[in-house]
Each structure stands twice: as C-alpha cells, then as structure tokens.
C-alpha cells in the first residue's frame, strides 16, 4: 500500500453492487478497491445512495482511507454542469485537491437490443457516459493540471 497515499481519486459509478453469490460485481467498486489498496482517498459518485454508503463503509474499514460518497446523476433532465460542479466542490472541500479522475459511470437499458431502444433509453446511455465524461473532465481539468494528475 502506498503508491497513491494522500492522493484524491474521483470515480464515477463507484458504488458497491452485491451479486447473488455475495461477491461484488461493480466495475467501479473494483477500481475503487484497487486505488484504496494503494492508499488513495476516494470520491465515489453514483445514483444509488445505499451502494455508495456500502462502498464507503467497507473501503474505509478494510483500507483505512477516507471515502466521500456523493449522489450524482447526469441525465437529460438535469443541470449537469451544476451536478458535476457540486461533486468537484465537495471533493475540494473535503480533500483539497484532485489527483485522478476515473470516468467509469455508464447506465443502459439492460437486456434491450439497440434496435428496441427508445429515445429515452438511448439518452440514458449517452448522458450517463458521454456527457458525464465531458462535464467531469471539464470541471476537474484545472485541479488535475495543478496536481499533474
């Protein structure tokens, strides 16, 4: 442990999802675990508060790091710049800097073929993935530039 000690990492879609066999199946949670093992403090975003709180509880217990869970939903009906600015402002207030940004979040209409997608289902995928990455990169850039992240 130690490569990312005292570094701050924002991971979108970092909540803890439990599979039917009891294991954790979220890619974001796997990424969070890898950074936690190296001593990074984490800002985890997602739509589901319970998954974020579960991730915070477990990662802090196992790795003695700090985790800031922030509910954030980038969608067609949201003021997405304000949502992302709020996340980044909370990260800076809590940790003072941002060293790494992982744009992991991506929602989709599971089990629906592309041909059967509605416009709303397609918007969900585009906003949660493409637009979220754009807004997070834009808002985090000055802090990442400062820390050479």
Residues covered by each model-derived region:
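Active-site loop of short-chain dehydrogenase/reductase
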Residues: 7, 97-98, 144-149
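Rossmann-fold cofactor-recognition segment
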Residues: 61-78
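Substrate-binding pocket helix/loop in short-chain dehydrogenase/reductase
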Residues: 112-114, 118-123
């Amino acid at each position: 442990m130690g490569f990312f000690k005292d570094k701050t990492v924002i991971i979108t879609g970092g909540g803890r999802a439990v599979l039917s066999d009891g294991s954790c199946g979220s890619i974001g949670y796997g990424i969070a675990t890898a950074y936690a093992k190296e001593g990074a403090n984490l800002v985890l975003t997602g739509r589901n508060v319970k998954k974020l709180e579960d991730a915070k509880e477990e990662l802090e217990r196992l790795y003695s790091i700090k985790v800031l869970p922030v509910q954030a939903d980038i969608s067609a009906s949201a003021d997405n710049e304000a949502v992302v600015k709020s996340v980044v402002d909370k990260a800076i207030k809590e940790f003072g800097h941002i060293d790494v940004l992982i744009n992991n979040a991506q929602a989709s209409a599971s089990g629906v073929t592309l041909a059967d997608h509605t416009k709303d289902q397609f918007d969900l995928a585009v906003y949660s993935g493409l637009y979220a990455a754009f807004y997070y990169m834009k808002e985090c850039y000055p802090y990442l530039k400062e820390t050479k992240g």
